[in-house]
């Protein structure tokens, strides 16, 4: 019997793709987060685009291209101990990601076409 749209373990293929893409996106967003901390340390405010972060040494890398990762964020002058949100996505779709002092968490319950997760302090447009 063939498995249609599912893996042998019964997990939907779409979930596998989301998980794989989340891993790629999260890895890059952790880099963004690290440089945001550096930028905040130097400037007492957060960068509002990747170009500002690229001005730091060592420079942050470009987002992955396979799959392509898009990152949009607005975090004006905030306390880094608080949470903020990032919209990021790949060819699977755009989702909200929540950045905290403990890392980047996927918010698969909140696609980028919807409202920001209520637990995030900032909404991005």
Regions found by a protein language model. Give the residues of each.
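Amphipathic alpha-helical segments typified by the pilin-like N-terminal helix
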Residues: 1-27, 34-35
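Periplasmic/extracellular, small/polar-rich flexible segments of pilin-like filament-forming proteins
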Residues: 34-125
């Amino acid at each position: 019997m063939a498995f249609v749209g599912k893996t042998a373990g019964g997990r939907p293929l779409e979930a596998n793709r989301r998980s794989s893409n989340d891993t790629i996106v999260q890895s890059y967003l952790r880099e963004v987060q690290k440089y945001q901390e550096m930028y905040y340390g130097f400037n007492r405010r957060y960068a509002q685009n990747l170009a500002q972060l690229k001005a730091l040494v060592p420079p942050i890398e470009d987002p992955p291209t396979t799959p392509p990762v898009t990152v949009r964020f607005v975090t004006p002058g905030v306390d880094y101990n608080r949470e903020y949100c990032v919209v990021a996505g790949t060819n699977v779709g755009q989702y909200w990601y929540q950045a905290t002092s403990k890392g980047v968490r996927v918010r698969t319950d909140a696609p980028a076409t919807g409202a920001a997760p209520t637990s995030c302090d900032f909404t991005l447009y």
